[in-house]
């Protein structure tokens, strides 16, 4: 199966299936000398792992990462970094009833049409289980970006189904199961999810992720524009159906006099562009929003077909997230880190010696 490698200079090649013995990845292109240990990666994996609240899948996976190569005496060597996460709580018997059927909204039908065969256990390769290794790889990129440039990446849930979540404080994000930047709204989110779970249904979400401290100049026009690669990365996350950069679709209703971010010696007046102009970073905050569809695995009976093309009714058993968006924040952060890391190295390779006479202005007016 092709399409398993992400990146140009900083690459991640992942492998494994939801119910296989392990998942993992090979990270290539990491500069030597970065202090790195398993604890650096584990901290990010623990934010994403399943079974952490009643509102997510109850599959219990410790998601313990093993560094197999590329690190010696606590520092990266510049050679490929092998990462492995062993699966420990597979329950494949839950999927026996869908071996010959297709779940509505899932990749089952598409995989069968493409390959003529599929691993039906937990979705196999199409499962969001694979995103654990993206988070692991993203932790490496995130650490290098922060230490080298001071880049800070932060994501949060900005809507759960019909409930908009106003941003109040970044300090609240890691203090609740939803990654909500507003502690006061958590009881409402919990009540909504409890009611939803009883109805045997699922719901979508909106995730916002930002990056501050990104220098101006990153991005490779015209086909590898920074915003295009960010959108590509986010659309590669399971269940993501839409991505916005900056004002996004709100740009449709804006006038040019409003949308164009005015510049002053003191900084940019606004950030409708989301930190990218002409496919190149401006030094402003990079702002990304993504729409995540409702979980396709629900216990309600729905119409479908079997492998013979016959009409059937199918209800999905097993342990599933009633809202996959609840655990998507660390994944979105990781993918943004991977894109920025790749473009930092690409910029250094081609334009590392460029000295611009025009002074940099702040990302926003103080």
From Swiss-Prot:
Cofactor annotation comment: Reduced FMN (FMNH(2)).
UniProt cross-references to CDD domains, sorted A to Z: Chorismate_synthase
Alphabetized InterPro entries for the sequence: Chorismate_synth, Chorismate_synth_AroC_sf, Chorismate_synthase_CS
Protein name: Chorismate synthase
Flavoprotein is among the record's keywords: yes
One Pfam family in the UniProt entry: Chorismate_synt
Domain of life of the native organism: Bacteria
Species this chain originates from: Dechloromonas aromatica (strain RCB)
Upper taxonomic lineage: Bacteria, Pseudomonadati, Pseudomonadota, Betaproteobacteria, Rhodocyclales
EC number(s) recorded for this UniProt protein: 4.2.3.5
Cofactor section: FMNH2
Gene: aroC
GO terms classed as biological process: amino acid biosynthetic process; aromatic amino acid family biosynthetic process; chorismate biosynthetic process
Alphabetized UniProt keyword annotations: Amino-acid biosynthesis, Aromatic amino acid biosynthesis, FAD, Flavoprotein, FMN, Lyase, NADP
UniProt family annotation: Belongs to the chorismate synthase family.
GO molecular function, one term: FMN binding
Database matches in HAMAP family: Chorismate_synth
Subunit structure: Homotetramer.
Amino acids binding FMN: 125-127, 238-239, 278, 293-297, 319
